[in-house]
């Protein structure tokens, strides 16, 4: 197969958080991107809610951080965020996990200039779509991938418009598979997965009801329910009187998703909130599996995996959607570097090496939290918690793309005491640039960056020469001469 002039640089299949982030970050770097999503629109359900500071740093790079924070309607209540293990909402609290946003912020605020956020997925995805399109990405909803052929020169894909039935062919230099945990692309390539597998089966219910007598207005708490009749979770959303309820079911006991009718879910919600006369408005009921998997390969020729296609993690800890956004950022800048001629194909191999390492940290942390809150029988068989700050801000990349200067095997460090060694996230340090106090984190974004002390003039001159040489290739190099910030008044 010879693709001399592909229709697009990158075809992204799947319009969730991972796929949309990939499209946004690629488009910002000038790549020609087509994203197809089989659903008719972005998510209509809250799904993955919450953005950790690392994700907010990436969103700042993508130019969407302020807009995401503006959609975060319940952010003002972060200080009251608590996680309770209870029999029913509003009942006796045998265990309360001291995990308030105040404590989480305390563990990370000295490591980053960006805040935590609580925006739900149905608010985030439209923002990503709008900004990706603004930068030139083409987004097609109600469009599915029916088949593809991959070779050394790229990919030829067949697409079907689900509205009209019309089929078309598109050629691309690369294909990014963001088609979810049951990724048809991954399976067609024979890429296997490893991990703990399916941990539990749940029914997810979105409903509306006035629960102000049980849940204080504006509450952002999350409840793990250990009721005599069921195990589940309950939490509010950013919309008034809209709530989420997840209940575990067990196929080995003959329980089936179809058993959870609106009537049955109403009965369980009444038990969960101790309100026998409640009449909830059931908006959605969906079955889903809690699982832990990591793909054995993240790249097969011109095809790369992101999001749940690459790794699946329990939602405990809230890191699944955040990790998918991180995948999108990493795969985008590496693809863009190869497309621009700044790097060779081997750089793409480092994407899977680095991504799988961080995903192992995320899965292990999520499993530890799951065991603590919902599955005590797993305690001792899963790794101990490292802590959110270390996993989110203290991870280290160890691929061949990193010029490591030591052989320390530890995959994380305390981000409150950053070492600045190669492979770790650039430390957050307040500096003065052009008379303005800003964070070193704010210096990064869509281009290569050189940080130099005031005496590093030769490095700055070299960066300027490189920028002139690469100017015709749309490559951008930024250098920053740093000085300590002035003393705070």
Curated annotation (Swiss-Prot):
This is Aklavinone 12-hydroxylase DnrF. Its cofactor is FAD. Its EC number is 1.14.13.180. Belongs to the PheA/TfdB FAD monooxygenase family. Monomer. The active site is at residue 224. Pathway: Antibiotic biosynthesis; daunorubicin biosynthesis; Antibiotic biosynthesis; carminomycin biosynthesis; Antibiotic biosynthesis; rhodomycin biosynthesis; Antibiotic biosynthesis; doxorubicin biosynthesis. SUPFAM superfamilies: FAD/NAD(P)-binding domain. Keywords: Antibiotic biosynthesis, FAD, Flavoprotein, NAD, NADP, Nucleotide-binding, Oxidoreductase. GO terms for biological process: daunorubicin biosynthetic process; doxorubicin metabolic process. One of its GO terms (molecular function) is FAD binding. Disruption phenotype: Cells lacking this gene do not produce epsilon-rhodomycinone and accumulate 11-deoxycarminomycin and 11-deoxydaunorubicin. The lineage of its organism: Bacteria, Bacillati, Actinomycetota, Actinomycetes, Kitasatosporales. It comes from Streptomyces peucetius subsp. caesius. Gene3D superfamilies: 3.40.30.120, D-Amino Acid Oxidase, subunit A, domain 2 (3.30.9.10), FAD/NAD(P)-binding domain (3.50.50.60). The gene is dnrF. S.peucetius subsp. caesius ATCC 27952, a mutant strain derived from S.peucetius ATCC 29050, is the only organism reported to produce doxorubicin in vivo. Aklavinone binds at residue 317.
């Amino acid at each position: 197969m010879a693709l001399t002039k592909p229709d697009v640089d990158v075809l992204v299949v799947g319009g969730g958080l991972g796929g949309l982030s990939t499209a946004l970050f690629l488009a910002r770097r000038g790549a020609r991107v087509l994203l197809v999503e089989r659903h008719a629109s972005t998510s209509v359900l809250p799904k993955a809610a919450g953005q950790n500071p690392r994700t907010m740093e990436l969103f700042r790079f993508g130019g969407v951080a302020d807009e995401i924070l503006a959609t975060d309607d319940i952010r003002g209540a972060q200080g009251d965020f608590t996680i309770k293990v209870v029999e029913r909402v509003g009942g006796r609290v045998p265990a309360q996990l001291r995990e308030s946003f105040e404590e989480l912020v305390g563990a990370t605020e000295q490591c980053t200039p960006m805040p935590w956020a609580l925006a739900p997925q149905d608010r985030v995805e439209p923002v990503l779509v709008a900004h990706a399109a603004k930068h030139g990405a083409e987004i097609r909803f109600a469009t599915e991938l029916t088949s593809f052929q991959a070779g050394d020169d790229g990919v030829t894909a067949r697409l079907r418009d689900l509205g009209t039935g019309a089929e078309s062919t598109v050629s691309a230099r690369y294909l990014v598979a963001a088609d979810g945990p049951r990724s048809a692309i991954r399976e067609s390539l024979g890429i296997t997965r490893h991990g703990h597998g399916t941990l539990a089966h749940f029914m997810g219910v979105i409903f509306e009801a006035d629960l102000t007598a049980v849940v204080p207005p504006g509450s952002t708490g999350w409840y793990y329910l250990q009721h005599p009749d069921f195990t589940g979770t309950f939490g509010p959303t950013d919309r008034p009187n809209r709530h989420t309820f997840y209940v575990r079911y067990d196929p080995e006991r003959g329980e089936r998703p179809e058993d959870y009718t609106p009537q049955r879910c109403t009965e369980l919600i009444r038990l969960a909130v101790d309100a026998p006369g409640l009449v909830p408005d059931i908006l959605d009921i969906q079955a889903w599996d809690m699982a832990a998997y990591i793909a054995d390969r993240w790249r097969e020729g011109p095809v790369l995996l992101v999001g749940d296609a690459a790794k699946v993690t329990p939602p405990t800890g809230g890191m699944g959607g955040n990790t998918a956004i991180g995948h999108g950022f990493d795969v985008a800048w590496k693809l863009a570097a190869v497309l621009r001629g700044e790097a060779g194909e081997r750089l793409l191999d480092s994407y899977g090496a680095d991504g799988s390492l961080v995903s192992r940290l995320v899965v292990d942390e999520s499993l530890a939290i799951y065991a603590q809150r919902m599955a005590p029988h797993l305690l001792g068989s899963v790794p101990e918690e490292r802590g959110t700050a270390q996993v989110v801000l203290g991870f280290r990349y160890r691929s061949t793309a990193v010029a490591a200067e030591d052989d320390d095997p530890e995959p994380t460090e305390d981000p409150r005491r950053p070492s600045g060694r190669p492979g770790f996230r650039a430390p957050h340090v307040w500096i003065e640039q052009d008379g303005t106090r800003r964070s070193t984190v704010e210096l990064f974004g869509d281009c290569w960056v050189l940080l130099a002390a005031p005496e590093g003039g030769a490095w700055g001159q070299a960066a300027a020469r490189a920028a002139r040489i690469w100017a015709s290739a749309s490559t951008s190099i930024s250098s920053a001469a740093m000085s300590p910030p002035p003393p705070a008044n």
